[in-house]
């Protein structure tokens, strides 16, 4: 079971995941004079200094903002890294909020994580939400646990390898508009 899956199931903490993956790698490669904690700190710092938009992403989130849609980021990522990426990419000015699991007290896909998210979004009901994500285990299962609609972003068309409900599936982000505004197809 991968480190991230073990985080999702509550078996590991975020630090055990982020440091443990380097510790395991170094053990497998026989590297003994490198501190996985320091490598992880350096990695997280540098990871926060780069970003890229997936095709159609910047245009889509900007268009949705202009149309009045409220948009939130839900992530199991590292808080400092996510905050840096949000600012660097300009998404901090587009998104209405960011919910990082380490600050919420629970990882995606736990129901408690989403309960905490909804508690921080006054006036937002589950019935008006859709979770768009690329992970079957954290995003689609999370949507199911949260009681919201789900849209699996599956750009490569891979087969489902996990039994989980997906309400929609898209290959390109621009396809989301037809789901949100079906009468304007």
Identify the residue ranges that each predicted region occupies.
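N-terminal helical cap/lid subdomain that shapes the substrate entry/recognition surface
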Residues: 1-55
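A short alpha-helix capping/helix-coil boundary motif
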Residues: 1-3, 37-41, 61-62, 94, ...
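A generic structural signal for short
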Residues: 10, 48-49, 70-71, 127-128
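Alpha-helix C-cap/termination motif
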Residues: 28, 67, 120-124
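Catalytic-core regions built around general acid/base machinery
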Residues: 56-68
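Asp-based, Mg2+/Mn2+-dependent phosphohydrolase catalytic module
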Residues: 62, 72, 77-185
């Amino acid at each position: 079971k991968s480190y991230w899956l073990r985080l999702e199931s509550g078996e590991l903490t975020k630090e055990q995941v982020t440091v443990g993956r380097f510790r395991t790698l170094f053990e497998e490669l026989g590297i003994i004079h490198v501190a996985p904690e320091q490598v992880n700190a350096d990695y997280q710092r540098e990871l926060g200094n780069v970003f890229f938009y997936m095709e159609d992403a910047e245009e889509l989130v900007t268009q949705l903002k202009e149309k009045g849609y409220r948009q939130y980021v839900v992530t199991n990522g590292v808080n400092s890294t996510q905050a840096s990426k949000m600012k660097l990419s300009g998404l901090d000015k587009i998104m209405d909020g960011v919910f990082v699991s380490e600050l919420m007290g629970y990882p995606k896909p736990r129901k408690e994580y989403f309960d905490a998210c909804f508690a921080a979004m006054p006036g937002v009901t589950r019935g008006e939400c859709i979770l768009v994500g690329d992970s079957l285990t954290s995003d689609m299962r999370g949507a199911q646990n949260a009681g919201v609609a789900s849209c699996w972003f599956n750009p490569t068309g891979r087969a489902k390898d996990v039994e989980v409900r997906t309400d929609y599936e898209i290959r390109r982000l621009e396809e989301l508009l037809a789901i949100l505004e079906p009468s304007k197809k």
